């Protein structure tokens, strides 16, 4: 069973210590009641990941753990077979003991677009909401963050993250908790909060923005990356059914509308730092994620549209700062 006690110990003397009033009970309940059919199998695989500490770890330019020279060909093959039991791998890529986990998403491209615009992460306490398997968390740590906490309710993402962490050798200050943001109390403690690829999955985007605000300290920075459409501050796409074959897409605003929402939620210094149409090379089928991907979600006759006829995925990154609220929006 995955143990969260080291996280409790690390935050006991930090500005997150008041979280300990509720978090152990919430995670204890999750461990008792979570019934995902594959979780016991994945935990058994995790228990087989007994490998020497890597001879090197690079989190600055990539997520590379080990050079591959420490393992025999047989050991390397065994490790790759174990890691493949956690398929599909969606966010990455990872390089582990010479094994290239070629994930569906080139998450390093997104990081390269975002990183130049954010406040330096040196010595910051960071929250990554909807962190997936944790790729960006490792890059945040490589950028100098003091502590990185990710939340994502998916048990597969949790196990993928735990696999990478166990193979990294050290007890790095990076932790993934199997929670949704609605399970977090208002912590008012993080220096930077990331929400990337989450907003359009939320039934109430304004509530999501308020929940993000509640996790930031006063003056803390929000990094929000999400799908957008073209248009003015009144433009919002509400898909009738599916968007890009996804049945959990609720609201896709224009950049202007999104900035207005943030202003209404008492954020300041709001600025759009990047817009980017998702390229077929950034999200694609791979040997580690053999299912449908972006090319199947687009109109084969016109890739500027989804199969449903909506504009193809376009993403924007917005940065904003938590301000003293003028009124109680919660």
From Swiss-Prot:
One of its GO terms (molecular function) is transferase activity, transferring alkyl or aryl (other than methyl) groups. Signal peptide: none annotated. Its EC number is 2.5.1.-. It comes from the Bacteria. The keyword Transferase applies. GO terms for biological process: tRNA wobble uridine modification. Catalyzes carboxymethyl transfer from carboxy-S-adenosyl-L-methionine (Cx-SAM) to 5-hydroxyuridine (ho5U) to form 5-carboxymethoxyuridine (cmo5U) at position 34 in tRNAs. This is tRNA U34 carboxymethyltransferase. The lineage of its organism: Bacteria, Pseudomonadati, Pseudomonadota, Gammaproteobacteria, Alteromonadales. The gene is cmoB.
């Amino acid at each position: 069973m995955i143990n969260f006690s080291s996280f409790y110990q690390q935050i006991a003397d930090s500005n997150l210590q008041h979280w300990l009033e509720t978090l152990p009970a919430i995670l204890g309940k999750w461990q008792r009641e979570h019934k995902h059919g594959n979780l016991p199998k994945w935990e058994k695989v995790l228990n087989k990941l007994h490998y020497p500490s890597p001879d090197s770890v690079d989190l600055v330019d990539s997520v590379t753990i080990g050079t591959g020279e420490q393992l025999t060909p047989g050991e390397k093959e065994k490790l790759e077979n174990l890691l493949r039991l956690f398929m599909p791998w969606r966010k990455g890529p990872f390089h582990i003991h010479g094994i290239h986990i070629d994930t569906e998403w080139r998450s390093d491209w997104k990081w390269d677009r975002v990183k130049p615009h954010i406040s330096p992460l040196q010595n910051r306490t960071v929250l990554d909401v909807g962190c997936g398997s944790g790729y960006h968390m490792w890059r945040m740590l490589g950028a100098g963050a003091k502590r990185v906490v990710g939340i994502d309710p998916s048990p597969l993402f949790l196990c993928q993250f735990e696999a990478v962490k166990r193979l990294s050798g050290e007890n790095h200050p990076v932790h993934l908790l199997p929670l949704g943001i609605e399970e977090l109390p208002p912590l008012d403690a993080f220096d930077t909060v990331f929400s990337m690829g989450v907003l359009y999955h939320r039934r109430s985007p304004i509530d999501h923005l308020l929940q993000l605000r509640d996790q930031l300290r006063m003056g803390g920075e929000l990094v929000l990356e999400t799908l957008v459409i073209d248009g003015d501050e009144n433009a919002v796409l509400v898909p009738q059914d599916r968007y890009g074959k996804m049945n959990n897409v609720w609201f896709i605003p224009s950049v202007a509308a999104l900035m207005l929402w943030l202003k209404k939620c008492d954020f300041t210094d709001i600025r759009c730092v990047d817009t980017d149409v998702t390229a077929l090379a950034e999200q694609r089928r791979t040997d580690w994620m053999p299912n449908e991907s972006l090319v199947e979600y687009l109109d084969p006759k016109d890739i500027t549209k989804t199969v449903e006829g909506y504009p193809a995925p376009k993403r924007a990154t917005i940065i904003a700062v938590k301000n003293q609220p003028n009124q109680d929006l919660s």
